[in-house]
Amino acid sequence: MEKQTVAVLGPGSWGTALSQVLNDNGHEVRIWGNLPEQINEINTHHTNKHYFKDVVLDENIIAYTDLAETLKNVDAILFVVPTKVTRLVAQQVAQTLDHKVIIMHASKGLEPDSHKRLSTILEEEIPEHLRSDIVVVSGPSHAEETIVRDLTLITAASKDLQTAQYVQELFSNHYFRLYTNTDVIGVETAGALKNIIAVGAGALHGLGFGDNAKAAIIARGLAEITRLGVALGASPLTYSGLSGVGDLIVTGTSIHSRNWRAGDALGRGESLADIEANMGMVIEGISTTRAAYELAQELGVYMPITQAIYQVIYHGTNIKDAIYDIMNNEFKAENEWS
């Protein structure tokens, strides 16, 4: 592939890690953010210490606060901003962009009030004459591992296979490999909903439960994620792939996962306000829990784990009571769909 110019919107941990992957592949990378001190740090010291204390970035990675300068003559734009501001940033891009580009996003969540997937938001806010079909970049990936060039395999999903293949080639190298998929709904919902289950898995750890319980919440969590995804139009097969069970395992079992750490802290009795203040990073699983719960209620999808976590987070239900409520649910067959 010829050298491409890529704007990465969002200098968080994942945006920074993906910027390094693109730079390693010989592309021009422009990171955009709205915190001048952070942007200056990236440009002056080639570090982003809020997320990576010991990592030095390549000096060719340049950061900007000016969106127009960032987007000038770019070939592709990668959104890696928090879910709650995706629509706002997309509107700003639509007002600034003056040519057609490839649009990708690597964020995982649902818009809090509308419950919409992020690709839907991007389609609504960026006119067709300025963009390709949206490509979702998702899968089992800790930024802390990708930034040190540990092996990572994820998915590029788009309704248009050729566009997904472009992104596959854009990112893939000896340590970072992408597979293509045309099931955008499946890949996107899997990436968003696994954060809820990760909060639950972390809570079990914080409460002192063992591996049996953690394995159960991942397996049963995958079942309810799949039910909701299929109700929205996804293929059930997607949930057995990298963006489904793969992402659920890595997020639901690792201390690297901010959603797992948030659940662990909840299990140990910390308040949600303290957890969010101490972590200093967006915990997508918190807002996604409400969106998924309300969506499941609307569609009539059975999601007992999501419901339990929703009750704990938004109604103050005791975590142990929520767990034992699930254990006392009506008996069901394992493969029962509702």
From Swiss-Prot:
Pathway: Membrane lipid metabolism; glycerophospholipid metabolism. Coiled coil: none annotated. Its EC number is 1.1.1.94. PROSITE patterns: NAD_G3PDH. It is found in: Cytoplasm. Its main location: cytoplasm. One of its GO terms (molecular function) is glycerol-3-phosphate dehydrogenase [NAD(P)+] activity. Transmembrane segments: none annotated. HAMAP family: NAD_Glyc3P_dehydrog. Catalyzes the reduction of the glycolytic intermediate dihydroxyacetone phosphate (DHAP) to sn-glycerol 3-phosphate (G3P), the key precursor for phospholipid synthesis. Belongs to the NAD-dependent glycerol-3-phosphate dehydrogenase family. This is Glycerol-3-phosphate dehydrogenase [NAD(P)+]. The gene is gpsA.
